[in-house]
Each structure stands twice: as C-alpha cells, then as structure tokens.
Amino acid sequence: MKFIVLIVIVFSHFSLFAQKDTVESKVYVLNNLNVEKQDTRERRQIAEGSGAVLSYMEWHTTTIDPGKSPHASHRHDDEEYIIIKEGQLKVTINDNSKVLGPGSFALFIPGDMHGFVNAGDTKATYYVFRYRSKAPVDLERAKKAGGSFMVDWNDIVFKPHDKGGIRNFFERPTAMLKRFEMHVTTLNAGIKSHDPHTHGAEEIVLLVKGNTEMQIAQSHQKADGGDLIYLSSNILHAIQNIGNEPSIYFAFQWQ
C-alpha cells in the first residue's frame, strides 16, 4: 500500500512539472518583454516550453544593426523558422541566399546550414520559432515536401473577401510536423473573423498591425501589432478587430 501511495505521489509530482512546462495559451505582448542586449543583437524572449505535438518549443525576437549578423551560420538538430517583422534580412540556406523584407518567412529543417545578415540601412527585427517534435524526426518526409524554403511576402497574392482578405502562404509537412499551414488574414474594422470554435491543431496568431481582442477559453485579451497569441489544442478561441482600421495577422497551425 505504501508503495502504491509513493507511486501516486511521484506521478503527481511529474504531472505538475509537466503542466508548468506547457506553454500557456494567452497573448504575449511584445512591448512587455524584457530586452536582453547582447554583443551582436537585442533579444526578447517570448515563451519556452512544450505542447501537444512538440516536446520543446521556444520563441523570441532578434534585432540586429545594419551589416551585422546575430551569429555565424550554423546547423542544429531542431527545426526552426523565422518571420521578419521589420527591415531587410539576407537569409542564407546552405548555398542559397535571398534578401527578404517584412512579412517574409523562412524555414530550416534539421541539419541544414543557415544564417542571417542585416542587408538594409536600418535595424532588422525578426521572430524566431525553434522546436522539436515528440514523434521521431522524418527528414525524408521533409525533403519530399521541398526541404528548407523561403517565402517572400511580395510573392504572395492577396485574395479579398467580404471580411477583408487572405494571403495563403503554404500547407505542407516538415521533418517535425505532419501538417504545417500558414496564412495571413486581413480583417476589416469592427468584425469577428469567425465565431468561437475549437480545433485539434495548435495555433499561433501573430499580429502584423491593428488592434484586436482574442477570446481564449472564457477570457478576452487585447492584442496589437507585434503581439503573439498561442492557442493550445482544442481551446475555445475567436478574434475580433476592435480598431478603426483593418487588422493584419499571421495564423499558423501545426499537427
């Protein structure tokens, strides 16, 4: 009996630890984040922990001066992608380089060499999303889907609709994710994108511009340009534009 009680206590301890390690579904306000000044960059830590699909995920922003790099080109066993907030960033994946501007995206599968240089004459800021999956890494699946890749904001067609419009970036598997889908929504002033709903996929909403309110479960939280919203699997949510101008935001889901 004492042995069973001990097992229950130990299990409860690790369950509590796991819960603490889970990334919280909420609005992460960019202006509230501490700025860590390093030799080559400024860094703002957004969140770090685990989720339903990922054993580890970490998000931060990096800001670098013109002509500077945050670090030397490198490779690692995690998967990673970036979204450029402002400035002009030269992104290199293996032997392929491209200068990307605000709203552009790049993903690096495990093992691929990648690096960044500020190619403009003003500061460049970008979001970094680094993660590893609970399931085994599938490099073959990633390579069949196209491997590491970049998406230039200027190449994405805007498709208007009655609530605003959409830019479809991609939907594909990666080495760590069976499904990764990304689009950008333009939501007209004063309206909801949709009614409160749930889905199995985890989701991040990244505000490019505007003033919104996101319902997360039973709470309502404001999110403005630059802020990030994390929505865990099957949590009730809905977003509304509470400003006087269109809001623009990334929405990306993974499973």
How would you name each of these model-derived features?
Residues 95-110, 218-234:
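Short acidic-glycine-tyrosine-enriched beta hairpin
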Residues 110-136, 233-255:
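Ligand-binding loop in jelly-roll beta-barrel domains
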Residues 18-57, 121, 125, 134-179:
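A short, N-terminal "cap"/entry segment at the start of jelly-roll beta-barrel domains
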Residues 77-79, 83-89, 200-213, 217:
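Glycine- and acidic-residue-biased ligand/ion/polar-headgroup-sensing regions
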Residues 68, 88, 113, 123, ...:
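Structural motif
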Residues 1-22:
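Bacterial Sec-dependent N-terminal signal peptides
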Residues 59-107:
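Mid-chain, structured segments of secreted extracytoplasmic proteins
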Residues 43-45, 60-75, 168, 183-199:
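Conserved short histidine dyad/triad with adjacent acidic residue
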